[in-house]
């Protein structure tokens, strides 16, 4: 309270009020310290300053700086070690996760068993064997452009093992070969087995192959004018029936893209089998009833053996996914006439297959960015033309027919029994007259690579449980990789340690040089020299004697 006639009031307080204020101040400071501790803001430590009149001030400051740098390096090294440990743990967790996933996959594969190992080739081989077992007469469909290359000795041997089965050859696509060449092929093949030339009706891909779609505007599709060879084949099949009441099953076999399903559609006069421009359309066995006495069995394509020539594998295999286009084109060009191919594509003279494909790309405008010829696209174009109908080619029959080891005179007589050879020759001659054969000038002569081998036993396609061996090998590889990674990490750590030690040595040497230079300067300025090492050795330091 301000006293009268005085400018300032008294600072005297009651003890109760003073103690109360002090208590509030203490509480406030305590809360402030607590908040500062939570927020992480701490009081900066007061730097230890060295007085100017202290001896060896430069050395002391350098020593303090060196210790600070060492502490900082230790912090960085600890941080790197922690990061490495975290990365190692993360890698271990990822490896454990991958191993658990692989174990699950391994268990699933074991549970599935052999069903998971089955492929499309195994299924095709199985259905072909079913057709051979159920058939009374086997009809092997050959491509008239290359009859020798589309013939399979393994399938013929499988048919001839059973004495009650008959084997016939059907020379399909007979309208794509010159007439004189076709006559020579008929003479060669008929000397071994009964052979019938055939031309299928134009086939349209059926959207629903299960239904029978009648072809419009065709009263009699299987006449000699529309389907040459159809009546001859039906007559032979009817003659092989044991009686009018008994029906026979005729199995149709052959390699891919020879026209097995098209033959059945032409004989049935409707689209009962699925057909398409791609190979391997038929995947399973299909039974079609032509009449009360004949039942046709459509089969998948024969599985090509990988031991054949590369060109035979490319031309006869079902899948074209793994085909090297440029290698296939190179093999095709080696087996066909160069001049005829140049005339067909209007190309100049070329030296090798790569130059041919390059010229074809320039001719057709197949260019990449910058006008570079697209050889891959040109090779695919030539390969597709050869596999399709755009490239018209044929093979010359051999001068001396080769003797097939499984075809003997007894086999030929047994297969021809019940079939009049003279009548068959007359029917084939009339079929050739009904065909519209092309001129040899418009075709390319192709050299056949010989008969194509097939795989008839599905056990040759299924490997005996390779899953466990592969997984064990993979585990071994992973262990080797882990050891390799561990050794690499150890080497990296050793290199890092060497680098760090080298850096430390450099820093220490630099500091020693600085200390020496500082000593020289101090000695010059101070006059009498004082040994710092001696001072370190003497623990008792006397300021009265050593410091002036």
From Swiss-Prot:
Compositionally biased spans, kind Polar residues: 524-534
Keywords: Coiled coil, GTP-binding, Nucleotide-binding, Nucleus
Main location: nucleus
Bias type Basic and acidic residues, positions: 64-107, 501-523
GO biological process, one term: regulation of cell population proliferation
Matching InterPro entries: G_CP_dom (IPR030378), Gnl3_N_dom (IPR014813), GTP-bd (IPR006073), GTP-bd_ortho_bundle_sf (IPR023179), P-loop_NTPase (IPR027417), TRAFAC_YlqF/YawG_RiboMat (IPR050755)
Protein name: Guanine nucleotide-binding protein-like 3
Species of the source: Xenopus tropicalis (Western clawed frog)
Gene: gnl3
